[in-house]
């Protein structure tokens, strides 16, 4: 998985705090790195130093989804979390949502024994996004049923330093950030990053 694990809750989040436009990003940025999990030289260096990198705790969220259900980080303890940040106006986001729904249905069918939780995150009113009601209507119109957390304050977007859509973070079983990928993902890549995170601990 590409990405500097130590920046997820550090300077990147601080630089983007309160900046809704940066948090929203744009479709070109999101599509520019579609599913690249190979990274560049800097990413490779980061991977080599992964063992010595500081562990970054996942954001301790308590947010409601499109159905009004409350979700917390603690309730997913012991599970890997596939955390997908997206927007209704984002073309690459729309393109990958059927695959995310497919994975959600697959893991949901396993019930309490499922090792993986699939969650979306949207920012109502941020960067051109509509209201929570608009996001819910979009999900219903497209028959998407996986939970989408409504980050009304933008705190979760800020913590993870979201600057383009879609961006997917993987959270390990211990509630720590394993890594992230920016750009549209294929189903194969989604399964690959899930497997990588499952194997981590």
What is the role of each PLM region?
Residues 133-174:
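Short, internal strand/loop/helix patches
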Residues 79-81, 86-89, 164:
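Short pre-active-site segment immediately N-terminal to redox-active cysteine/selenocysteine motifs
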Residues 53-55, 60-81, 105-107:
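A short beta-strand-turn-helix
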Residues 112-130, 145-153:
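Thiol-based oxidoreductase modules, predominantly thioredoxin-like and allied folds used
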Residues 61, 76, 85-86, 138, ...:
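Conserved hydrophobic/aromatic "anchor" residues
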Residues 1-58, 201:
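N-terminal targeting signals for export/organelle localization
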Residues 79-80, 95-122, 140, 187, ...:
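Conserved helix-turn-beta segment immediately C-terminal to the redox Cys motif
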Residues 170-201:
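Thiol-/selenol-based redox modules, centered on thioredoxin-like
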């Amino acid at each position: 998985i590409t990405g500097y694990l130590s920046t997820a809750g550090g300077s990147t989040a601080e630089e983007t705090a309160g900046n809704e436009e940066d948090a929203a990003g744009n479709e070109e940025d999101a599509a520019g790195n579609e599913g690249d999990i190979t990274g560049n030289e800097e990413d490779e260096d980061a991977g080599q130093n992964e063992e010595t990198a500081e562990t970054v705790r996942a954001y301790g969220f308590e947010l409601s989804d499109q159905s009004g259900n409350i979700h917390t980080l603690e309730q997913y303890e012991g599970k890997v979390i596939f955390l997908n940040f997206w927007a209704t106006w984002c073309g690459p986001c729309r393109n990958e949502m059927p695959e995310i729904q497919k994975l959600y249905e697959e893991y949901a069918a396993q019930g309490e024994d499922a090792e993986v939780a699939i969650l979306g995150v949207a920012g109502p009113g941020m960067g051109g996004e509509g209201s929570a009601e608009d996001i819910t209507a979009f999900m219903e119109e497209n028959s998407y049923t996986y939970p989408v957390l409504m980050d009304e304050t933008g705190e979760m977007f800020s913590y993870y330093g979201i600057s383009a859509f879609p961006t997917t973070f993987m959270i390990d079983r211990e509630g720590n950030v394993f890594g992230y990928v920016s750009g549209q993902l294929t189903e194969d890549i989604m399964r690959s990053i899930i497997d990588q995170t499952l194997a981590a601990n």
